[in-house]
């Protein structure tokens, strides 16, 4: 984070879009401020093309005036029912709203809105770090307005609400998810009173639509260390309401002195591991769900101890129901996660034994195009604290990958090798090894490589005969 004076802020806002905003606001004699995430990210040195503007008065009027000033390159959208507008210009999105104050009923997160002051608007913001504003009017251009010491919280790495957190979260329960999400994204801590309010108000999450919750979960999942967010959701009690199947994994049971590992924290370790190697959202979710079937499959065996037989299959059958409840897409993405969960034990079984061509080929055939993702998941699943055992698995997985690459290369070459070879050409045209044979072989190979003909006998034979005739060779009669 950097320390910025008002003069520094004015310098950073010395961009055409902000000067245009300043000019139209002054022409309309309206106070105009850039607020929220854009201001926060200026201090954090995080690039942003999304600009939120609050106008004390009509935000729509300022948006319309800005569009007129910018001309055809700007695109204006007006949402009069909500009193908001948006201008898109050269890759930037500027959102406009009039300063307002809000009140809520207990059974809805949709507020009753009325016109207000900048102070009213800052009061309704979710967190102090998002409640800072910078004036854009020429006389005060670059002046920071920070009534809740959001800058101090930004410096200290704290997530805190501007007003009473119980009111903040009860009024709009989605803010509880946003609280955890910001803490995860920014690697901040949730202030104690704010966290306690999360615990007290967790049941209010039930009035939030599944789509909104899913959006916040996905944002947590796309951070560098999603485990931080899921631990916070678990600690405050939200996770039990959103993903009860996952919280059931937070248990260690001991019998006859034999215990199984805590699969909740093992899973979070796997998720963090996989995030170092992929930005694929659904592969990350597959990592979170890979052992989701363990609580249902757990059995005690006097000889073997704790077992989780078929937990991969049981877990894969749970995925559609979880996706449906979370309002996740019920399409190829769901089937991909289901497939990864079902197959995640296969490479481990191969790596634990002798790595044979036939076993790897069966794996490659069953996994298809998803083989690389499956291998990435399985490598992330190695969390053993036994360094020797962990290294043995890593070495074996490396052998599996090498075998996969070798088989892919061999299959690729076989696929591109014309099914009519040189020996058949020589026999067909009564030739000895010669330049003519090489020319005919190359003709077939080029045609296959360039995808001009399929690598099938009949079309290749027709091409071969055509080329032989052009070369003046004796073509055998059928």
Q: What does each model-found stretch correspond to?
A:
Residues 1-478:
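Catalytic cores of the polymerase beta-like nucleotidyltransferase superfamily
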């Amino acid at each position: 984070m950097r320390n910025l004076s008002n003069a520094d802020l004015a310098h950073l806002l010395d961009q055409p879009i902000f000067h245009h905003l300043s000019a139209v606001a002054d022409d309309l004699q309206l106070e105009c401020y850039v607020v929220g995430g854009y201001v926060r990210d200026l201090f954090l040195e995080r690039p942003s093309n999304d600009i939120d503007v609050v106008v004390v008065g009509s935000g729509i009027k300022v948006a319309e005036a800005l569009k007129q000033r910018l001309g055809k390159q700007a695109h204006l959208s007006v949402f009069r029912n909500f009193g908001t507008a948006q201008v898109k210009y050269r890759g930037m999105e500027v959102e406009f709203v009039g300063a307002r104050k809000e009140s809520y009923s207990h059974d809805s997160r949709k507020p009753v809105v009325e016109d207000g002051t900048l102070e009213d608007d800052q009061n309704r913001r979710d967190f102090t770090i998002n409640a800072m504003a910078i004036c854009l009017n020429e006389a005060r251009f670059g002046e920071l307005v920070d009534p809740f010491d959001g800058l101090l919280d930004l410096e200290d790495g704290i997530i805190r609400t501007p007003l009473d957190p119980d009111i903040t979260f009860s009024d709009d329960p989605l803010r509880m998810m946003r609280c955890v999400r910001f803490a995860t994204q920014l690697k901040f801590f949730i202030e104690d009173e704010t966290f306690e309010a999360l615990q007290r108000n967790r049941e209010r999450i039930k009035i939030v639509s599944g789509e909104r919750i899913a959006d916040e979960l996905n944002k947590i999942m796309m951070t560098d260390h999603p485990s931080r967010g899921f631990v916070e959701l678990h600690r405050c009690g939200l996770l039990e309401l959103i993903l009860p199947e996952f919280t059931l994994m937070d248990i260690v049971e001991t019998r006859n002195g034999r215990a199984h590992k805590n699969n909740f924290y093992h899973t979070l370790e796997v998720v963090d591991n996989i995030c170092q190697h992929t930005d694929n959202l659904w592969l990350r979710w597959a990592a979170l769900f890979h052992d989701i079937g363990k609580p249902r499959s757990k059995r005690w065996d006097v000889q073997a101890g704790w077992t989780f037989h078929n937990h991969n299959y049981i877990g894969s059958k749970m995925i559609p129901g979880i996706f449906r409840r979370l309002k996740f897409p019920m399409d190829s993405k769901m089937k991909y996660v289901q497939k990864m969960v079902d197959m995640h034990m296969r490479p481990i079984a191969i790596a634990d034994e002798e790595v044979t061509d036939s076993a790897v080929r069966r794996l490659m055939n069953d996994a298809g195009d998803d083989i690389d993702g499956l291998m990435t998941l399985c490598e992330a699943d190695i969390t053993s604290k036994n360094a020797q055992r962990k290294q043995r698995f890593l070495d074996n997985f490396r052998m599996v990958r090498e075998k996969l690459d070798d088989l892919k290369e061999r299959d690729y070459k076989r696929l591109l090798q014309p099914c009519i070879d040189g020996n058949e050409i020589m026999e067909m045209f009564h030739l000895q090894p010669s330049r003519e044979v090489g020319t005919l072989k190359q003709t077939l190979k080029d045609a296959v490589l360039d995808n001009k003909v399929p690598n099938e006998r009949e079309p290749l034979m027709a091409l071969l005969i055509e080329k032989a005739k052009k070369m003046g060779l004796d073509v055998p009669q059928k």
